[in-house]
């Protein structure tokens, strides 16, 4: 099977373009998030594999989603059901989110540190990343004591490993070669 993002991209792009046109990016993000959660539900998953006809599946899916999905969102669900693609809704949501961040000139950065970062440290990291990436940065911070000290920052394709454990691993690799 083709990679999920390849299958999901046209749906996400169409939804995003429509959302931009209608000035409804936030509401579409919420709809897609909810639909993605429904598609990942353990009760719903078996039904997505072809147990029902596409129209029955679309009707059931829309009924489960209820008021959370508007008429245009329902149309997307129907098209995806007709094409047997409802299982890629989580990937559609992820891509939609990426398109939205790109459009808003935002990037989410994951910061894993050995200890809790202070607000000042978070601000410094955010400012440095914003300067480097020329985008607004939203930090998602977490703590991993196994890093010993330092941080690992991931923003899109950019990975900055400033952790002591990372430095020790690189040193070990150099010594072994």
UniProtKB/Swiss-Prot annotation:
* Chief location category: membrane
GO CC, one annotated term: plasma membrane
GO molecular-function term, one example from the UniProt record: proton-transporting ATP synthase activity, rotational mechanism
Which Pfam families does this UniProt record tie to the protein? OSCP (PF00213)
Q: Which organism is it from?
A: Shewanella loihica (strain ATCC BAA-1088 / PV-4)
On assembly, the entry states: F-type ATPases have 2 components, F(1) - the catalytic core - and F(0) - the membrane proton channel. F(1) has five subunits: alpha(3), beta(3), gamma(1), delta(1), epsilon(1). F(0) has three main subunits: a(1), b(2) and c(10-14). The alpha and beta chains form an alternating ring which encloses part of the gamma chain. F(1) is attached to F(0) by a central stalk formed by the gamma and epsilon chains, while a peripheral stalk is formed by the delta and b chains.
Q: What are the alphabetically sorted keywords of the record?
A: ATP synthesis, Cell inner membrane, Cell membrane, CF(1), Hydrogen ion transport, Ion transport, Membrane, Transport
Task: State if ATP-binding is listed as a keyword.
Answer: no
From which domain of life does this come? Bacteria
- UniProt keyword annotation of Cell membrane present: yes
Family assignment from sequence similarity? Belongs to the ATPase delta chain family.
Q: Cross-referenced InterPro entries, in alphabetical order?
A: ATP_synth_OSCP/delta_N_sf (IPR026015), ATPase_OSCP/dsu (IPR000711)
Q: What does this protein do?
A: F(1)F(0) ATP synthase produces ATP from ADP in the presence of a proton or sodium gradient. F-type ATPases consist of two structural domains, F(1) containing the extramembraneous catalytic core and F(0) containing the membrane proton channel, linked together by a central stalk and a peripheral stalk. During catalysis, ATP synthesis in the catalytic domain of F(1) is coupled via a rotary mechanism of the central stalk subunits to proton translocation. This protein is part of the stalk that links CF(0) to CF(1). It either transmits conformational changes from CF(0) to CF(1) or is implicated in proton conduction.
Subcellular location(s) of the protein? Cell inner membrane
Q: Indicate how the chain sits in the lipid bilayer.
A: Peripheral membrane protein
Task: Tell me what this protein is called.
Answer: ATP synthase subunit delta
Q: Which SUPFAM superfamilies match?
A: N-terminal domain of the delta subunit of the F1F0-ATP synthase
């Amino acid at each position: 099977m083709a990679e999920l993002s390849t299958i999901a991209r046209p749906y996400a792009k169409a939804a995003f373009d429509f959302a931009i046109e209608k000035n409804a990016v936030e509401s579409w993000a919420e709809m897609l998030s909810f639909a993605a959660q429904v598609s990942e539900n353990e009760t719903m998953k078996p039904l997505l594999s072809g147990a029902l006809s596409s129209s029955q599946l679309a009707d059931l899916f829309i009924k489960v989603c209820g008021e959370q999905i508007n008429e245009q969102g329902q149309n997307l669900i129907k098209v995806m059901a007709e094409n047997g693609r409802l299982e890629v809704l989580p990937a559609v949501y992820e891509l939609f989110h990426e398109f939205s961040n790109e459009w808003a000139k935002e990037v989410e950065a994951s910061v894993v540190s050995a200890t809790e970062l202070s607000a000042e440290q978070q601000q410094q990291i955010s400012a440095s990343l914003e300067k480097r990436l020329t985008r607004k940065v939203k930090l998602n911070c977490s703590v991993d004591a196994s890093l010993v000290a330092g941080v690992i920052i991931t923003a899109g394709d950019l990975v900055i490993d400033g952790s002591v454990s990372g430095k020790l691993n690189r040193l070990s690799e150099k010594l072994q070669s």
